[in-house]
A protein has these predicted regions:
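A short, structured loop/turn motif at beta-sheet edges
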Residues: 164-171, 210-212, 221-227, 308-314
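Solvent-exposed N-terminal domain segments of exported/luminal and surface proteins
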Residues: 27-156
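Extended, loop-rich substrate-binding clefts of extracytoplasmic carbohydrate-active enzymes
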Residues: 125, 129-211
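N-terminal secretory signal peptides that target proteins for export/translocation
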Residues: 1-8
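Beta-strand-rich recognition/accessory modules
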Residues: 63-64, 70, 277-350
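C-terminal motif of bacterial Sec signal peptides marking the signal peptidase cleavage site
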Residues: 22-23
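Acidic (Asp/Glu-rich), glycine- and aromatic
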Residues: 202-248
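Polysaccharide-binding surfaces and accessory modules of carbohydrate-active proteins
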Residues: 229-290
Length: 350
């Protein structure tokens, strides 16, 4: 009897250790891989990735500051910095588009460390997620663009572009895209306030929390700029204009502006291998930062207003996404369900 009793503390100790180890596992992660050569094999984290018959040598980085003439997009595996929770992942294209592109999880888990954004057939068979949206030249979901009075345009020309992993903890991570010396294409309708001799500096930080599919987006400018905008694209991108599409939502709520879209399209140009995906996108802009609603052929947009804080001009908003056909248990399977979900989601945002 005494021997059995003495085993209990040992068993309980092992159980406690297992619980502790599980509780320490990260629930968010970041991914930022630069393409290299075999000569980079001594770098920390170096990996050899196989894409069909192609072999790619990569190593992780945390920041890249680049001249705008440099082809950063093609020098990065998955084309930019990325962040993920168990439910969703997002990447930021590192070029003039700076577009947000979503990756949906079929199984709630962290997986970019294994799939590197492009899961092979074996991983797909194990229930891994995948890219779900063809963004083309659109705003995607929650990218920051400029409204020239007729359509959205990319953030250019600039003196410098950068992307980086700002911070990462077990339950939260922040990634950033930034520019320096942006020569804003001002018009009479979008005047620029403040000194602009050296252009405008702007950073956009995207923060993801564990257990969330949404992100908070914080915009910081060296001077106020009228004409900044964000929003959601049409699905497909060459679909009906927002005003003619019943699967669009533009709604003024008591606490801000809610923009959303719903639709079905191929996620990539390879329609032979990939099936169409039904996707819901949304952006919520709190009332102090929500300006006029505008749209062009492929994007439903809201102009951003900013507040001056600590000699900087700041604004924030939120974005979210659902992969209705990709997820095992999606939060919505129809446009009506998606819009209802979003109204509940937006109520708690400020």
């Amino acid at each position: 009897m005494s021997r059995s009793i003495n085993r209990y503390p040992r068993v309980l100790g092992l159980l406690g250790l297992l619980v502790f180890l599980v509780s320490c596992q990260p629930r968010v992660a970041t991914s930022f891989w630069k393409i290299g050569t075999p000569a980079d094999s001594t770098r920390a984290g170096y990996a050899v990735l196989h894409e069909g018959k192609k072999v790619r040598h990569c190593y992780p980085i945390t920041e890249w500051v680049a001249d705008p003439t440099e082809d950063t997009y093609h020098q990065l595996h998955h084309h930019g910095v990325a962040v993920e929770s168990e439910l969703m992942a997002y990447r930021i294209y590192f070029d003039k588009k700076q577009t947000i592109d979503p990756y949906c999880k079929r199984t709630p888990q962290l997986e970019l460390a294994q799939s590197y954004w492009y899961p092979n057939d074996s991983l797909l068979a194990l229930g891994y997620g995948d890219d779900i949206l063809r963004v083309s030249g659109t705003v995607g979901v929650g990218s920051v663009k400029y409204w020239n009075g007729k359509k959205h345009v990319h953030i250019e020309p600039v003196a410098e572009r950068s992307e980086r992993i700002v911070r990462q903890s077990r339950n939260s991570a922040t990634i950033e895209v930034a520019v320096k010396g942006w020569q804003v294409p001002t018009t009479k309708r979008q005047p620029l306030h403040g000194p602009t001799t050296n252009g405008v500096d702007m950073s956009v930080r995207y923060t993801m929390q564990a257990g969330h599919r949404d992100m908070r987006c914080d915009v910081t400018l060296s001077v106020p700029v009228e004409g900044l905008c964000t929003g959601v694209q049409s699905i497909p991108a060459k679909g009906p204009e927002p005003t003619a599409n019943s699967q669009w939502l533009s709604e003024q709520l008591p606490n801000g502006t809610l923009l959303a879209s719903w639709g079905t399209d191929w996620p990539v140009n390879d329609s032979a291998k990939y099936a169409k995906e039904t996707v819901g996108l949304a952006v919520f802009i709190p009332k102090p930062y929500a300006g006029a609603l505008v749209h062009d052929k492929s994007n439903n947009l809201c102009l951003l207003k900013s507040k001056v804080e600590s000699q900087k001009s700041k604004a924030h908003f939120y974005l979210t996404c659902v992969g209705a056909t990709k997820e095992t248990h999606p939060c919505a399977t129809t446009a009506e369900e998606w819009f209802a979900y979003l109204r509940r989601w937006a109520k708690g945002l400020r």
